[in-house]
Amino acid sequence: MGVFMRDEGRMETEDIILGKAKYEDWRSIYRNVWSRPETAEYMVWKVTADEDGARERIQRTIVWQETHDAWLVYERGSGQAIGFAGVEETEPHIYHETGIALGPEYVGRGYGKQILRLLMEYCISLDGQEFYYSTRAGNLASRALALSCGLTYHHSERRTDQRSGKTYELEIYKKNLESVGVGYEAG
């Protein structure tokens, strides 16, 4: 069961917490996510090369999260920052996820499903009616996550990777939120 604590800027499930970044998170998010090429592969960000870069990046992340619906993902048991996630309202009542990333050691534990369900429930709490999720066509784990959470394929768009200049297919998945709950209560 998920819980929202808006006054504290966080959401929780049994295994994870979505919370706003703090400076001291730089080391764990760097080690678990930002330094990992396998995590960046299907994303639109570049790997952070060193600890100094991670310290600078966490400062930018903190500033960004102050004005956006974006969070770090913390593993409840260890308290470590193991990923990030976010959403944005693109039109009234229409939300898009803005990226979900987990460090490779944390994939396959059900955390992605918990994150995606929390994001959808958060959007419902904001009177969201449609939720969109996107993934690169080759990212089979991300596609499986979308389908496992009840999203359906909507359409594809050809995009250009700003890092490499190569084109790729971005698959867009959709779920109507007003008619179907996602298994969590807002508190």
Language-model-detected regions and their locations in the chain:
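Acyl-donor (CoA/ACP) binding surface of acyl/acetyltransferases
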Residues: 1-28, 32-36, 74-187
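Hydrophobic residues in alpha-helical segments
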Residues: 33, 43, 62-65
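Conserved GNAT-fold acetyl-CoA-binding loop/helix
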Residues: 38-60
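Secondary-structure boundary/capping positions in well-ordered alpha/beta enzyme cores
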Residues: 46, 68, 126-130
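A short helix-loop-beta-strand connector motif used in the catalytic cores of GNAT acetyltransferases and
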Residues: 59-72
